[in-house]
Amino acid sequence: MRTLKIEPLTKEAFAPFGDVIETEGSDYFMINNGSTRRYHKLATVETAQPEDNAIISIFSAEKLEMPLRIRMLERHPLGSQAFIPLLGNPFLVVVAPLGDVPVPGLVRAFLTNGRQGVNYHRGVWHHPVLTIEKRDDFLVVDRSGSGNNCDEHFFTEDEQLLLDPQSNQ
């Protein structure tokens, strides 16, 4: 079983899968009589149909025990999905490129710094939220509308991957 190498999350490395939502290194302009920096358009919400809505939810996720066997990935073909951490804890992101099914050899893992969010582009394969330190809350921006917007792919036992933060140290 292949152990995923966990990479630091950067805009450049994550670009094939979506957007990194962070203020560090991002352009801004001043608003509210000069008292507020606006980091404008850090990500774009994608929806498939004009009648779809962009919605905001909060996910409260329990810590997952590591190492974790990656048995499945999911994708949202009708809209993007963004996760912004609310409590400042680092979390893991596991993704695979667009395609009919995720290719195990192309799966990548990233570690956020706790202040970075991610916006998965439409159709990008990803693992459900991976909280690693303690229970965590995420502001989630995604799509509401008709149609099935969640495809799941389960790997065969031979294709499964191991996510082990200790292996990177």
UniProtKB/Swiss-Prot annotation:
Gene3D superfamilies membership: Ureidoglycolate hydrolase
InterPro entries listed in its UniProt record: RmlC_Cupin_sf, UAH_cupin, Ureidogly_lyase, Ureidogly_lyase_bac, Ureidoglycolate_lyase_dom_sf
Broadest EC class assigned to this enzyme: lyase
Keywords recorded for this protein, A-Z: Lyase, Purine metabolism
Signal peptide: none
Example GO BP: purine nucleobase catabolic process
Gene Ontology molecular function, alphabetical: ureidoglycolate hydrolase activity; ureidoglycolate lyase activity
Sequence similarity: Belongs to the ureidoglycolate lyase family.
Reactions mediated catalytically: (S)-ureidoglycolate = urea + glyoxylate
Self-association state and partner proteins as the record states: Homodimer.
Disulfide feature: none
CDD domains listed in its UniProt record: cupin_UAH (cd20298)
Protein's UniProt name: Ureidoglycolate lyase
Catalytic activity, EC: 4.3.2.3
Alphabetical list of Pfam families matching this protein: Ureidogly_lyase
Cofactors: Ni(2+)
Free-text function comment from the UniProt entry: Catalyzes the catabolism of the allantoin degradation intermediate (S)-ureidoglycolate, generating urea and glyoxylate. Involved in the utilization of allantoin as nitrogen source.
Pathway listed: Nitrogen metabolism; (S)-allantoin degradation
